[in-house]
Amino acid sequence: MKNGVYYNGQGDFKMETGGVMSELKKKINYTVVCVNEFADRYHLSSKEAFTYLYDYRGIEFLKENYDIEHTLSLAEAVDDLTTICRNNGGRY
């Protein structure tokens, strides 16, 4: 658990106190988790992964498709990010 926040595996991020976060915080935290998962898969730093995902429209994709993407496994979300980025000129 980082910074008192955890992903419950059912599409919700929870605070350590158990309170449900605002929708914006959920989206931000989900994006952070996806960036870190992408970084882990491709052996990048978090900053490198974010820059790559931003440049090749992965971040935009997550923002536009949060309602669907957050219901998938993180592995599936990273697969989707990989596809989006490759379709926009990325190499991963």
For each feature predicted by the language model, list its residue ranges.
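C-terminal alpha-helical interaction appendages
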Residues: V5-Y92
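Compositionally biased terminal segments
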Residues: M1-N3
